[in-house]
């Protein structure tokens, strides 16, 4: 879990646009972020396995 101070710092508007970085809104993780789903890989996997993401299915071959 991310520190509250880091989540607040990321949410603030920066002086320069390039300094902005994405964080998962569910857990606050800054790495392994998927823009398409707006969350990190861990939360994405958890919600996909629960069936809460429409159109996402587990692949098997």
Swiss-Prot record:
GO MF entries: rRNA binding; structural constituent of ribosome; zinc ion binding
Annotated binding of Zn(2+), by residue: 24, 27, 40, 43
An annotated GO cellular component: small ribosomal subunit
Coiled coil: none
Job of this protein: Binds 16S rRNA, required for the assembly of 30S particles and may also be responsible for determining the conformation of the 16S rRNA at the A site.
Oligomeric form and interacting partners: Part of the 30S ribosomal subunit. Contacts proteins S3 and S10.
The protein's name in its UniProt record: Small ribosomal subunit protein uS14
The species this protein was found in: Syntrophotalea carbinolica (strain DSM 2380 / NBRC 103641 / GraBd1) (Pelobacter carbinolicus)
Gene giving rise to this polypeptide: rpsZ
């Amino acid at each position: 879990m991310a520190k509250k101070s880091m989540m607040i710092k990321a949410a603030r508007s920066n002086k320069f646009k390039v300094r902005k970085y994405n964080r998962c809104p569910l857990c606050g993780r800054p790495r392994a972020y998927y823009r398409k789903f707006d969350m990190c890989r861990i939360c994405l996997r958890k919600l996909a396995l629960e069936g809460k993401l429409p159109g996402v299915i587990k692949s098997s071959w």
